[in-house]
């Protein structure tokens, strides 16, 4: 993500479990990113509801005997809180599929995986990434003016 615009700066890479094995894919992620660097800001996860990814990656790394993948122990940006605030503080209805053009949630992904409908999984991941980036860019373009407006209300 571009720190200036929130837009993508590279191409989407989908690590496909059906082309390899989970342990190999997770190892590739650890090797090809700066996630394990000692410097906390080398890899900053940005997403929506990162708790889901955190729990999954942490548990699967443990199962495979890989280094700890704890995406919430270093700096991260989770836009879920913005969705909750935009829904008036309500968690219900604040999913990415409820506040963007994302057509559905990920409930069908395990089913598609089980029956080998991998094209639908790729389409889903691409749609989710596209809608996340669109939302992120929109927020980046509007939040600076909110900060200026907020500063004008300071009494000190």
Q: What are the functions of these language-model segments?
A:
Residues 1-36:
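Conserved RNase H-like, two-metal-ion catalytic cores of nucleic-acid enzymes
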Residues 6-11, 39-156:
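Metal-dependent phosphoesterase core characteristic of DEDDh/y 3'-5' exonuclease domains
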């Amino acid at each position: 993500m571009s720190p200036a615009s929130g837009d993508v700066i590279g191409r989407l890479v989908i690590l496909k479990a059906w082309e390899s094995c989970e342990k190999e894919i997770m190892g590739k992620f650890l090797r090809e990113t700066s996630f394990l660097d000692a410097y906390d800001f080398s890899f900053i996860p940005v997403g929506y509801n990162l708790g889901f990814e955190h729990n999954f990656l942490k548990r699967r790394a443990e199962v495979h005997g890989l280094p700890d993948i704890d995406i919430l122990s270093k700096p991260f940006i989770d836009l879920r809180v913005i969705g909750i605030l935009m829904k008036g503080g309500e968690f219900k209805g604040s999913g990415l599929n409820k506040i963007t053009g994302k057509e559905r949630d990920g409930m069908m992904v395990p089913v598609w995986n089980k029956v080998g409908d991998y094209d639908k999984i790729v389409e889903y991941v691409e749609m989710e990434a596209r809608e996340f980036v669109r939302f992120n860019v929109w927020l980046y373009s509007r939040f600076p003016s909110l900060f200026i407006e907020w500063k004008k209300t300071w009494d000190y």
